[in-house]
Swiss-Prot record:
Belongs to the ETT1 family. It comes from Debaryomyces hansenii (strain ATCC 36239 / CBS 767 / BCRC 21394 / JCM 1990 / NBRC 0083 / IGC 2968) (Yeast). InterPro entries: Nro1/ETT1 (IPR024318). Residues 1-44, 86-107, 241-261 are annotated as: Disordered. The keyword Lyase does not apply. Its main location: nucleus. It is found in: Nucleus. Keywords: Nucleus, Transcription, Transcription regulation, Translation regulation. One of its GO terms (biological process) is regulation of translation. Required for correct translation termination and probably involved in regulation of hypoxic gene expression. One of its GO terms (cellular component) is nucleus. This is Enhancer of translation termination 1.
Length: 443
């Protein structure tokens, strides 16, 4: 059987954005169809059109991204700025003085302009996901825009990050969406792992250049979304075929070939991703590297993540989120060895079995203990003093770790006792939300 993915988080770790009230979006359909207004903060120059574009893009990026009108508005604004820039360049050859006083738009557009333009074009594909031709058209245009930007800004790290993001997002929307379990690599159907390798290579190029030039500020919330998109992609690959098999549970039970139906042949376009752990390992290695680069920013600012500040730097919640994702990835990796240990140790039906999943009882115990301890280290760094759920994540990991020791041993009791203290605190802070977990621990 194909190995299961243990490291990635996918949508389970992705923070869910709350939907806004739809009523506010339809109050004035005339204005909505013809205007886009963005509230600029005090730092944005109202006379700087590129700054206004950045503000519009930032508003979109932090939203649910479900408004095609906004995306089209961004693209139209990019078109206008590009036309003005090209006009200024043409005028420069005829009248340099005239070009220098042209106020319609900047003469040379910055790298992030091309990044915004390309990402907006790629986002349009989300609104036309059922039309493969349009999806291809939007991604082709997005990648062309990035490449044009790289011609103007050779080696731009920001544009390299953008290109890797677009290439990763392209894979599920343009390629995986057209596949079935029976699909094979042939004319017009590429190996998806080769597409993914190309995207990850570009990400690594951007990552290495940013580190070499000490541009650690590029390791921010926006670029963390690249790793999240990659993680979501791995989850899609893991679950590929299951959606088509969903239905009457009785049918599944009667169908002895059910598991075989969702296995992929070696000729399947997704086989090269599903049947290896290298992509899961890549995700975690580069997420840890991302964390280290965030720490470089904090060190430069003289800020310790352990320090409690009245006004918290924006990098600190970002750091906690990264630590949470890494910690949860170790928890997921621990699932199989910990299950092997408890089965071999406590299940009488396996009394004569020496190994499961290639692991003995002692091996599975040691591996599980290491993984849970590592997860616990990261989850402690992810703790938010204002968020009880983060405390509970720590407590539950302590309970799982305690379960891997001998019954009533000192190690087990220590983990259980500490977990109970944390759960009691969280339960009191949430008016009894964690009462069931606490009671199970105490019985």
């Amino acid at each position: 059987m194909a190995p299961k993915r243990h490291l990635g988080l996918g949508k389970a770790a992705k923070s869910k954005k709350q939907k806004k009230d739809d009523s506010s979006e339809v109050e004035n359909p005339v204005q909505q169809s013809n205007e886009l207004t963005v509230e600029l903060n005090e730092e944005v120059d109202a006379n700087d059109e590129v700054s206004q574009l950045r503000a519009l893009w930032k508003t979109h990026a932090k939203s649910d991204k479900d408004n095609e009108l906004v995306v089209n508005g961004i693209i139209h604004e990019c078109d206008r700025l590009l036309r003005n820039s090209n006009l200024a360049e043409n005028e420069d050859g005829e009248d340099k003085n005239k070009a220098s006083t042209n106020e319609d738009g900047p003469k040379e557009l910055p790298a992030d302009f091309h990044s915004i333009y390309a990402l907006a074009l790629a986002d349009l594909a989300l609104f036309h996901s059922t039309d493969v031709n349009k999806v291809k058209e939007f991604f082709d245009a997005a990648l062309e825009r990035v490449d044009l930007g790289l011609q103007s800004h050779t080696g731009s790290i920001e544009l390299l990050f953008t290109k890797s993001r677009i290439l990763i997002n392209q894979i599920p929307l343009q390629y995986i969406s057209q596949l079935t379990v029976e699909s094979k690599v042939q004319d017009g159907v590429p190996k998806i792992d080769e597409k993914l390798d190309a995207a990850l290579k570009i990400y690594e190029e951007a990552e290495n250049q940013a580190k070499a030039l000490k541009q650690y500020e590029l390791f921010n919330e926006d670029n963390l979304e690249i790793l999240q998109a990659f993680d979501d992609l791995l989850e899609i690959v893991d679950n590929f075929g299951k959606d088509n098999s969903e239905g009457d549970e009785s049918d599944k039970e009667d169908d002895g070939d059910y598991e075989e139906e969702i296995q992929l042949s070696k000729k399947h376009p997704l086989y090269g991703i599903r049947n290896t752990d290298k992509y899961n390992e890549w995700w975690r290695d580069h997420t840890i590297q991302f964390l280290q680069n965030v720490d470089q920013q904090l060190e430069k600012l003289g800020i310790s993540y352990k320090q409690e500040n009245e006004t918290e730097n924006a990098l600190l919640p970002l750091r906690r989120e990264i630590c949470k994702r890494i910690g949860q990835s170790y928890l997921q990796e621990a699932e199989i060895p910990s299950t092997v240990f408890t089965t071999l140790k406590y299940d009488e039906g396996f009394a004569d079995v020496d190994q499961l999943e290639g692991l003995t009882r002692d091996e599975s115990q040691k591996i599980s203990q290491y993984l849970f301890k590592t997860a616990l280290d990261y989850l402690k760094m992810a703790e938010d003093k204002e968020e009880p759920e983060s405390w509970v994540n720590i407590a539950e990991s302590m309970i799982s770790l305690g379960n891997l020791y001998e019954l009533d041993s000192e190690e087990q009791e220590n983990y259980y006792t500490e977990a109970e203290k944390i759960l009691t605190k969280a339960n009191n802070a949430t008016n009894g939300k964690y009462e069931d977990i606490l009671e199970n621990l105490q019985t």
